[in-house]
């Protein structure tokens, strides 16, 4: 395994790639402690059955990697994930952060329509389910915030902010993988071509340097100018289903706030055991009068 200054190995400890490294809805404090030691750590090949990889934990570094695909290439094939050189994508869909400045569908070459559908549709059911479950769980865990949202349910800016905070706090996709294309340095650690990198979105979204008191669910966090969370990636390779996820989550929130009574836990939730997806196998809920 690599032995490089500034990147202690964590193969002897329980790595954040383990499914049980995340309590329901709140990242394990192991990520916070590890990030305080180093922004980049080495995960050995025993991690979640994956080959060894560098784990990037800090918001600024994760965002940098997401916005430089000419250095950090997605580990996928197909025309929607073609190489990017000189700031221009070849066979890739250019999109802006949601809400888009232009109709992103119109920006996809006609010959790639099938690939667009093939990339987006298979991921929607599971990702949407995890997103909605995570948003609901945030409200179940914070009944006081739910009550305050109900009192101000006509405040569109607050509702929009609450949707973003649900996404940040829960982070339905825990990590994404990249391959280093050319030598670079992240967090003081040299990375070599061909090495794998796990970008921990959940760690970046709970980085206290970017989001004060990151473990707190604060629906008004994004009302004022704030750094965007990284649930959907960043730049022209951001998630193509971002708008759809936001629409569904907002619709669920509005419907819950308009309904008399309030959701309450109806039993212990059973988390999905995955090192990449953040969701539930079961989330029992009852409705109180």
Task: Please name every model-derived segment.
Residues 202-224:
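Conserved cytochrome P450 K-helix/beta-meander segment immediately N-terminal to the heme-binding cysteine loop
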Residues 127-151, 240-260:
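Cytochrome P450 catalytic-core helices
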Residues 24, 153-189:
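Conserved cytochrome P450 K-helix E-x-x-R motif and the immediately C-terminal K′/meander segment
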Residues 192-193:
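Residue-level recognition of short, solvent-exposed, well-ordered loop/turn junctions
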Residues 33, 38, 51-53, 168, ...:
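Cytochrome P450 heme-thiolate "Cys pocket" and heme-binding signature region
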Residues 1-123, 233:
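Active-site substrate-recognition loop segments, prototypically the cytochrome P450 B′-helix/B-C loop
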């Amino acid at each position: 395994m690599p032995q490089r200054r500034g990147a202690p190995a964590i193969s002897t400890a329980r790595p954040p790639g383990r499914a049980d490294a995340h309590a329901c809805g709140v990242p394990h404090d192991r990520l916070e402690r590890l990030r305080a030691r180093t922004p980049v750590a080495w995960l050995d090949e025993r991690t979640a059955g994956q080959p060894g990889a560098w784990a990037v934990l800090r918001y600024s570094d994760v965002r940098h990697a997401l916005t430089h695909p000419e250095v950090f290439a997605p580990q996928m094939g197909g025309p929607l994930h073609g190489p990017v050189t000189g700031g221009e994508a070849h066979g890739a869909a250019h999109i802006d952060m949601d809400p888009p400045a232009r109709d992103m569908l119109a920006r996809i070459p006609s010959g790639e329509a099938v690939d667009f559908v093939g990339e987006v549709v298979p991921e929607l059911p599971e990702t949407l389910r995890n997103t909605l479950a995570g948003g609901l769980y945030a409200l179940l865990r914070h009944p006081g915030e739910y009550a305050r949202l109900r009192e101000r349910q006509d405040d569109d800016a607050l509702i929009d902010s609450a949707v973003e905070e649900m996404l940040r706090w829960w982070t339905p996709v825990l990590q994404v993988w990249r391959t280093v294309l050319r030598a670079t340095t992240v967090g003081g650690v040299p990375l070599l071509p061909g090495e794998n990198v796990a970008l921990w979105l959940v760690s970046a979204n709970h980085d206290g340097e970017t989001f004060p008191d990151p473990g707190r669910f604060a629906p008004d966090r994004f009302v004022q100018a704030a750094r965007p969370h990284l649930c959907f990636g960043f730049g022209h390779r951001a998630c193509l289903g971002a708008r759809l996820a936001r629409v569904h989550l907002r619709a669920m929130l509005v419907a819950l706030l308009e309904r008399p009574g309030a959701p309450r836990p109806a039993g212990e939730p059973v988390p999905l055991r995955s090192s990449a997806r953040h969701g539930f196998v079961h989330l029992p809920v009852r409705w109180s009068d």
